Amino acid sequence: MNVKIEGRRKIRAKVAIPSDKSISHRSIMIGSLARGTTEIENFLFAEDCLSTINCFKKLGAEIEIKNDKVIVKGKNYSLSVPQQVLDCGNSGTTTRLLLGILSTQEFEAVLDGDSSLRKRPMKRVTQPLSQMGASFEFLEKEDCLPIKVKGKKNLKPIDYTLPVSSAQVKSALIFAALKAEGKSVIKELPMSRDHTELMLKSAGADIATCFENGFYKIEVMPSNLEALKIKVPSDISSAAFFIVLALICEDSEVIIENCILNPTRTGIIDILKQMGADIEIGNVEIQNGELVGTIVARSSNLKGVVVDKNDIPRIIDEIPILAVAAAFADGKTIIDNASELRVKESDRIKTTLEMLRNFGAECYELENGLEIVGSRDNLKAGIVNSYNDHRIAMAASILACAVEGESTILNAECASISFPNFYEILLGHSKKV
């Protein structure tokens, strides 16, 4: 599906943002591994999260939808042998966290995914899990899906420092460590998003976290999990597209309610404020251990910034849309130390730069990042290939709304991976000036 967008738009609206993808994934996983029945309200019915549901159904979890809630009857970490390959679709979260979970099960299972997921590296997860006693076989290409996993009942505890901060790798190790024979210690620098730790603590897991010698340290003891009642807040990674839309379009304001404000996820807000963005946060409260609140963003004159390397894990999913904001800012923006972008759904350094250049932006590739010389006057309508990367498709669409003329986004249907009704909301709420 290709989408044409007529530019010079503005938006003044309260926007309903989809539920958080990270928490939706983990709610299914924790519910499936817990004792009792977990109820999930506001679940994100997007392709990635549906892949997680389908995989856990194949592993014996009873999952049904009742009155707009997802009901999960837990298996108490005793999953069933799957009779089919576990198809993870496009979801790296599903794959990598499942590798940790399946490491605790005394059976073999095969994980596979689509052509994009098959290119993403998996040894970063399998190597530490192998140290704990699980076995892995790459069936076609080294380091890539499909993978055969053979778990073990009594895994060895691990003391492991992540070479690169990653919520997915960290979470896989935590899920495995819950069934190890003693205390495991996992460290990372800087700290990545901590939804797994918070949600598992809520479910009764014996997990302690602290900062030690600059590192974020997690201690995990063997634990059973209890069922939860979860209300999933709105996803700040999805909200970021409409926040930036309001900032770069004239006479615009966006209000987003019940949005997750976990400090490990709000890097995009902090950096946009450094750039001069008019953003207000209000109505802050705690739900299931997570900060949530209302975000209001208004048209702003932005300036370029140098992004601190310690903020990269907090904005790793938002870098394409941050780059769009940078293209409209006065001056130079540098985003570096972001090698993780190379192994996302696309090489997001290359695809983000190509997107910006197709709209006329001046930008340069760094070894592990981007340099963007902002100038609203240089920007014009363009044609952009999404490379089937949902965040590239949506970032390009936001940029298209703020420039003169008609732009075309190729293969735009991939937005549904995380934001099923993105174009309906974007074109419904924004109007031609």
From Swiss-Prot:
Pathway(s) this gene product operates in, as recorded in its UniProt entry: Metabolic intermediate biosynthesis; chorismate biosynthesis; chorismate from D-erythrose 4-phosphate and phosphoenolpyruvate: step 6/7
Binding residues annotated for 3-phosphoshikimate, in chain numbering: K21, S22, R26, S166, Q168, D317, K344
UniProt KW DNA-binding keyword: no
Descriptive protein name: 3-phosphoshikimate 1-carboxyvinyltransferase
Family: Belongs to the EPSP synthase family.
Assigned EC number: 2.5.1.19
PANTHER family hit by this protein: AROM/DEHYDROQUINATE SYNTHASE, PENTAFUNCTIONAL AROM POLYPEPTIDE
GO biological process, one term: aromatic amino acid family biosynthetic process
Self-association and partners: Monomer.
CDD domains reported for this sequence: EPSP_synthase
Keywords linked to the UniProt accession: Amino-acid biosynthesis, Aromatic amino acid biosynthesis, Cytoplasm, Transferase
Reaction it catalyzes: 3-phosphoshikimate + phosphoenolpyruvate = 5-O-(1-carboxyvinyl)-3-phosphoshikimate + phosphate
EC supergroup of this enzyme: transferase
Record: active site: D317
Organism listed in the record: Caldicellulosiruptor saccharolyticus (strain ATCC 43494 / DSM 8903 / Tp8T 6331)
One GO cellular component term noted in the UniProt record for this chain: cytoplasm
Residues involved in phosphoenolpyruvate binding: K21, G92, R120, Q168, R348, R391
SUPFAM superfamilies per UniProt: EPT/RTPC-like
Subcellular location: Cytoplasm
Coiled coil: none
GO molecular function term, any single one: 3-phosphoshikimate 1-carboxyvinyltransferase activity
Principal location: cytoplasm
Its job: Catalyzes the transfer of the enolpyruvyl moiety of phosphoenolpyruvate (PEP) to the 5-hydroxyl of shikimate-3-phosphate (S3P) to produce enolpyruvyl shikimate-3-phosphate and inorganic phosphate.
